[in-house]
């Protein structure tokens, strides 16, 4: 299974959240874990972020099992 990484700027675009809010969610373990890709760089597993977004949509529409 091939997994793609996306950078923080792409996560911001997909979620509409600021960098600070994403970091807050990470700290509170309410967002998919980041992957360290360099000494000062992180990325996220694209499929995990997509699933997280889909879960938020389902929750807002009362579709949670």
Where are these regions (language model features)?
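Polyanion-binding surface elements
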Residues: 1-21, 48, 54-57
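DNA major-groove recognition helix of helix-turn-helix
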Residues: 26, 53
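Beta-hairpin "wing" of winged helix-turn-helix
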Residues: 34-36
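Nucleotide phosphate-binding site architecture
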Residues: 32, 50
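Minor-groove-contacting beta-hairpin "wing" of winged helix-turn-helix DNA-binding domains
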Residues: 41-45
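A short, structured beta-strand/loop element
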Residues: 18-20, 25, 31
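Short intrinsically disordered terminal tails
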Residues: 61-65
